[in-house]
Regions:
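C-terminal hydrophobic helical "lid"/dimerization subdomain
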Residues: 1-5, 204, 229-230, 254-258, ...
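Glycine-rich beta-strand-centered segment in the early N-terminal region that forms part
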Residues: 24-39, 52-101, 142-145
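Glycine-rich cofactor phosphate-binding loops and adjacent beta1-alpha1 units
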Residues: 167, 192, 209-289
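Conserved acidic E/D residue at the C-terminus of a beta-strand in Rossmann-like folds
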Residues: 203, 270, 294
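Local beta-strand N-terminus motif with an aromatic residue
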Residues: 83, 172, 218, 239-240, ...
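Mid-domain Rossmann-like dinucleotide-binding core that forms the NAD(H)/NADP(H) cofactor-binding site
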Residues: 140-225
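Short, well-ordered coil/turn residues at beta-beta hairpins
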Residues: 38, 89, 244-246, 348
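NAD(P)H dinucleotide-binding glycine-rich loop of Rossmann-like/cofactor-binding domains
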Residues: 96-178
Length: 348
């Protein structure tokens, strides 16, 4: 009998369970097996738990945010080798289809492309994970970067970095970011690299507002109730030049376009539990450009370089650490936003 391991598994709607499964094996020449050293819980995992991700397959190991050590590689893998410390990209991508060649890797057309890990195939809240297309999905961690510093490179930081990149931010802009959760903060860190004139962070949770003020004092903060008037008072052209919606609520979706100036860019980063309405009659004349900022993992090597250079630091987001054996406690803490939690690291 092959080696078995502990995994956190999607059993059915509303139910995850810690259980034993066989250790994964190579299934394709482009696969790698990674010993997971550190994983994290993402809000997308909660969406799976609550049945909001129809493509999620019951029985799979959840988790798509992790780092680890390469244990074994397929014969076609060239960029990583056993012993390498690596980040794991949430998106699997072949590197060869139309969308991959354009750099839109989250739209990879391969059957294992897109968000597969922890959704359609076994993910990384486990001791080991099989990573398809390892040359594309794994990035070597620089020696000077710790696992904790690199933990978010393949998911929430990739999301924030991609969203900032497609938002066409200039140094003259007022940028509004709605939502100061983990992805919102990673979006903030990525926007700060663009050096806009001012950044406004909108958040309803006072503890998260305190976190922003403590760590990023140059950023203006405001509650949702006061956001519209505050943005009007702190922008030159009747609203924000760029709005990034990272909160994922019906009210924040509306707030995003309301706070945008005419001809602004509104980038929707959030994942919603239900359909949203775009009230075109109310918006008529604003001539807004909407973009969607789903995670795209083509910049992970660049973000690792920026971390190594000290230009991005996501480690303060890790407020709690649990062993895999206590992952149910970690989920309860994260889902209920207790004790000032922002992100939880899970030692596997």
């Amino acid at each position: 009998m092959g080696k078995r391991m502990q995994t956190y598994t999607y059993v059915s709607k509303g139910k995850f369970e810690l259980m034993e499964k066989p250790k994964p094996v190579l299934m394709h020449e482009r696969d790698a097996i990674v010993k997971v050293t550190l994983a994290s819980i993402c809000s997308s995992d909660l969406h799976i738990k609550h049945g909001s991700v129809p493509r999620a397959v019951p029985g799979i190991t959840v988790g798509h945010e992790m780092v680890g050590i390469v244990e074994e590689v397929g014969t076609a893998v060239k960029n990583v080798k056993p012993g390498d410390r690596v980040t794991v990209n949430v998106e699997s991508f072949c590197g060869e289809c139309f969308f991959c060649k354009k750099g839109y890797v989250n739209n990879c057309t391969d059957e294992n492309g897109g968000w597969a890990l922890g959704c359609r195939i076994d993910g990384g809240q486990a001791e080991y994970v099989r990573v398809p297309f390892a040359d594309q999905g794994l990035n070597k961690i620089p020696d000077k970067v710790t696992d904790r510093q690199a933990l978010f490179v393949g998911d929430v930081l990739a999301t924030g970095y991609w969203a900032a990149r497609i938002s066409e931010i200039t140094e003259d802009d007022t940028v509004l970011i709605i939502g100061a959760g983990p992805t919102g903060i990673c979006t903030l860190l990525s926007v700060m690299l663009k050096n806009p004139k001012r950044i406004i962070m909108c958040e309803k949770d006072e503890k998260r507002m305190h976190f922003i003020r403590e760590h990023y004092p140059e950023v203006l903060t405001v509650s949702p109730e006061e956001c519209f008037d505050f943005v009007q008072a702190n922008s030159e052209h009747g609203g924000a030049d760029v709005v990034l919606e990272v909160a994922g609520a019906e009210s924040t979706f509306r707030l995003a376009w309301e706070c945008a100036r005419p001809h602004a860019i509104v980038t929707v980063v959030a994942l919603y539990d239900k359909a949203q309405t775009l009230p075109l009659p109310d918006m008529y004349g604003k001539n807004l450009t909407f973009k969607t900022g789903g995670v795209d993992g083509c910049d992970c090597e660049e973000t690792l370089r920026l971390i190594a250079e000290g230009k991005i630091n996501t480690e303060p987001l890790i407020t709690h650490t649990y062993p895999l054996s206590r992952i149910e406690e970690a989920y309860e803490l994260f889902e209920n936003k207790r004790n000032g939690v922002i992100k939880v690291a899970v030692e596997c």
